Amino acid sequence: MNNPFKFGTIVGNEYFTDRTVELEEIRRTMLGPNHLVLISPRRFGKSSLVKKAVNGLDRPAVFINLQQITGIEELASMLLKGVFKLFPIERLKHWMTHFRFIPTISTNPLTDAVDLSFPIATDETAVLEDVMELINKLGAEKGRIIIVLDEFQEILEIDKGIDKKLRAMMQVQENVNYIFLGSQESMMTDIFERKKSPFYHFGKLIYLKKIPHEDFFEYVRDRLTPVMDDNATKAAETILSFTLCHPYYTQQLASQVWEIAAYESVNQDIVEKAIERIVTTHDYDY
């Protein structure tokens, strides 16, 4: 029997919790020509939610985390690598003959991972423009592409004025849907709601909230029942009263409760014991 609770990584399938309303809202938006802005605190499950929604659309999609990006050329490279995962490289090489700066492309024979580099002293803005134009052309030919940009508030740290440049490139793309994810509410709101911002009202805005108590309660109780029987109801309530329905911490605590109930001879105060173990474990980090 496997632990039915998962935390700390992107989850899907049986590990995914509710969010049916948000899933449908994302899907409906992506079926049209508009873009989406999704804001919530960290560890609320934004990435898992969007990945599940996008996977259900059967559309080509590229996922980029802007925390990993340090410059404009690197952003262009990451977007291009994402496209390489979707389409045959030889076909893309033909399209790239029209690039102003053609990258050197290599493939790892063991992992099939693609690496690329642009010539030294390249005009970074021109590189990004060419990549964005390629993505739009592919969307016209293969079906509208979805680009997911996680931790989008980091765009302001990549390069001064990149928000204006990126907005200018995106606004002419008719065959791309963008999903912007962000965990810094004030920064994301400033980017998409401030009138003087280049991205003002660029997409439909959704603030992701906690999972409703009743939905989360059923999810936790049903997965604890095989190892706790009638005690699962009380345990689920105790867990949620402690975590206040925070997605990450609920999954983490429920996972620890399940481990104790499944493998140890403990019948009372299981939730309290689980909390104590988690706290003790994190104490070692300091």
Please report, for each region that a protein language model flagged, where it lies by residue.
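Short, conserved phosphate/pyrophosphate- and ester-handling motifs at nucleotide-, phospho-/glycolipid
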Residues: R19, S47, H246
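P-loop NTPase nucleotide-binding core
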Residues: G32-F44, S48-I145
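Conserved nucleotide-binding/hydrolysis micro-motifs of P-loop NTPases
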Residues: P33, Q67-G71, E154, S183-M187, ...
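Short glycine-/polar-rich loops that comprise or flank the Walker A/P-loop
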Residues: D58-A61, E174-V176, H201-K204
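Conserved Walker B catalytic segment
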Residues: S117-E185, E193
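Helix-loop-helix "sensor" segment of P-loop NTPases
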Residues: D190-S241, Y263-S265
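Amphipathic alpha-helical "lid/sensor" segments that cap RecA-like P-loop NTPase cores
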Residues: D222-D285
